Amino acid sequence: MKKSYSPYSKFPVGVAGLVNDGRIVSGCNVENASYGLTLCAECSMVSNLAMTGGGRILAVVCVDKNGELLSPCGRCRQLLFEHGGKELQLLTPDGPQPMSVILPWGFGPDDLPQ
C-alpha cells in the first residue's frame, strides 16, 4: 500500500494474486492528473505477472488502506478473467468467489475465432 500513487483520490488500493507456480504477484493503483489514464491496482499486478514470468492467476485479494476488501471494477474483472479464467477465485465479503460468478458472461480468448 505504501507504493500506491493516489494523490488525487487519496484512496490507495493494493492487490495480490497467487500464481499457478506458487508466486505471489502484487500491484497498487497509480493515478494520473488526467483521471482516465489512472491505472487500477489489478492492472499493475497483471503487469507484474508478465514481467516476472507470466502464468495463470489462481486467486486474488484486493483491499483498501484499512485492509477492507474491495471489488474490482468492470475493466479489471475482464483483465482478471483474461489472466485467470473462470476458475480464478476472488476473495469477497461472502468468501472466495470464482470469476464465473463475478463476471458471468466474461469474454476471453476462447471467444475469438482461431
Regions from the PLM with identified roles:
Residues L49:
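Basic DNA-binding helix
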Residues E42-V46, C73:
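A general structural signal for well-ordered alpha-helical segments in protein cores
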Residues V15, C28, L37, R75:
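Gly/Ser/Thr-rich helix-start
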Residues N29-C43:
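Compact, glycine-rich, soluble single-domain proteins
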Residues M1-S6, T52-Q114:
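C-terminal binding/interaction regions
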Residues L18-N20, N29-V30:
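Histidine- and/or cysteine-centered catalytic micro-motif in compact active-site loops
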Residues Y8-V19:
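Short beta-strand scaffold segments in enzyme catalytic cores
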